[in-house]
């Protein structure tokens, strides 16, 4: 029954860290966090069998690191209706929480794939998609772009071509009408039994509509979208893990307005071309500005690298380094 809610193995855990923790708590049973509220957690040991449980006392203390508490998608060990341990995460998506203070916010854990849902209206923004990709890939999760509202776009192929030009060919891009049955077929390769997928994107991008289509029922509330900026209200108010008919698990999330880096990200996946060129520079500490023998500048000179792409690489790298510096200062 655990496999139906995303247990990653056909039997007992194959991961050494999981084995060790399960051995310590041998009288406890595993469960998955399917909802997280201020008042506590809802977990499941099987599909459609939610259980309200008490969290660890330490998690309720003021000042306890938020990223060390359980989040939707996490696996925990239960003693009765009480969480006694958090199993190690295989993957996680996190960002810097909104506000002036440095605080990490975990979005979801133990994912295989994250669908970046983007409407082909005023919501379409390749640079924002790029930020999502950095956050997702840095957490060990596979990003997939899902373009919705194809009926509002005159040339869907052109939008897909923009992303193909901007991103690595390895990034999957799928365009669908979220109201129809086609997403079930188009997205099936990522929705196989035992896999876990999260929906990320702005409010009004079509996440709730897509969720209802994949579920095969109208379970999630769908809101109206403002015409002036293609933004919607938060119809999804909390994260929830939902078993799909395909055998996969889907985590629906509220829309995110800010995508701040924590300082732990890297750009190896999303800027693999620049990272590879950098290894060919004459100097190991080349800043790709005016240094002789710079392979990155040479690529711009011969037209194989878009200078705007390098500019954005510098911008994102600067944000990541800045976030890392602020995190370090906060520790001392």
From Swiss-Prot:
UniProt KW keywords: Cytoplasm, GTP-binding, Hydrolase, Metal-binding, Nucleotide-binding, Ribosome biogenesis, RNA-binding, rRNA-binding, Zinc
InterPro entries in UniProt: G_CP_dom (IPR030378), P-loop_NTPase (IPR027417), Ribosome_biogen_GTPase_RsgA (IPR004881), RsgA_GTPase_dom (IPR010914)
UniProt GO molecular function: GTP binding; GTPase activity; metal ion binding; rRNA binding
Keyword RNA-binding: yes
PROSITE patterns in the record: ENGC_GTPASE, G_CP
Pfam families hit by this protein: RsgA_GTPase
Biological process, per Gene Ontology: ribosomal small subunit biogenesis
Swiss-Prot/TrEMBL cofactor(s): Zn(2+)
Binding site for GTP: 148-151, 201-209
Span of domain CP-type G: 103-259
CC per GO annotation: cytoplasm
Cofactor: binding details: Binds 1 zinc ion per subunit.
EC number: 3.6.1.-
Residues annotated for Zn(2+) binding in this entry: 281, 286, 288, 294
Subcellular location: Cytoplasm
Main location, first listed in the record: cytoplasm
NCBIfam families membership: ribosome small subunit-dependent GTPase A
Role this protein plays: One of several proteins that assist in the late maturation steps of the functional core of the 30S ribosomal subunit. Helps release RbfA from mature subunits. May play a role in the assembly of ribosomal proteins into the subunit. Circularly permuted GTPase that catalyzes slow GTP hydrolysis, GTPase activity is stimulated by the 30S ribosomal subunit.
Subunit structure: Monomer. Associates with 30S ribosomal subunit, binds 16S rRNA.
Family: Belongs to the TRAFAC class YlqF/YawG GTPase family. RsgA subfamily.
Name of this chain's protein: Small ribosomal subunit biogenesis GTPase RsgA
